[in-house]
Design a protein with these regions (language model features):
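Beta-rich strand-turn-strand
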Residues: 81-86, 94-101
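Short aromatic/basic micro-patch
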Residues: 71, 121, 144
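Acidic, metal-coordinating catalytic segment for phosphate/diphosphate chemistry
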Residues: 11-45, 51
């Protein structure tokens, strides 16, 4: 099966994303259009477990949904930075915890139908006190849950 990009038009370029509309030739010879959100930087997230066996989460406002959402600590991978270095940095910036160990778990493609974003996922342990360094426009609440509590929250849609 082959797909051919016949033309590509940039419709928006911002700080975080670029949006393109591409005209494609489909495998049957027909033509179709596809919108693509191109992330300028990929991201990394971390499942961090404290010494009491609880998972660390951050709750923060996410404007597209206009509500506070519970998330794992995560952030963009800066130019020249590894995914592991990014999660160690983000974990400390968001939660004030340093990880002695971070293990790569997998790479996720959360919205493959229209977005190029890739997220590297890590598992971190051996947490010690660090220094929380939030961005000026970043306000987070740190929450800790056991694995069982986190799974129950997922099942309840929380």
């Amino acid at each position: 099966m082959s797909y051919e990009v016949l033309e590509s038009r940039k419709t928006y370029e911002g700080k975080i994303v670029t949006i393109t509309v591409d005209k494609l030739r489909m495998p049957d010879g027909s033509e179709a259009y596809r919108e693509t959100v191109i992330r300028k930087k990929n991201a990394a997230g971390v499942l961090a477990v404290d010494t009491d066996g609880r998972l660390l989460f951050v709750r923060q406002y996410r404007h597209p949904f206009r509500e506070m959402l519970l998330e794992i600590p995560a952030g963009v991978i800066e130019e020249g930075e590894s995914g592991e270095a990014a999660v160690l940095r983000e974990l400390e910036e968001e939660t004030g915890k340093r990880a002695g160990r971070a293990e790569f778990l997998c790479e996720l493609y959360p919205s493959v139908g229209f977005c190029t974003e890739k997220i590297q996922l890590f598992f971190a342990t051996e947490l010690t006190a660090g220094t929380q360094k939030l961005d000026a426009d970043e306000f987070v609440e740190i929450e800790k849950y056991t694995l069982e509590e986190a799974i129950a929250m997922i099942h309840k849609g929380e």
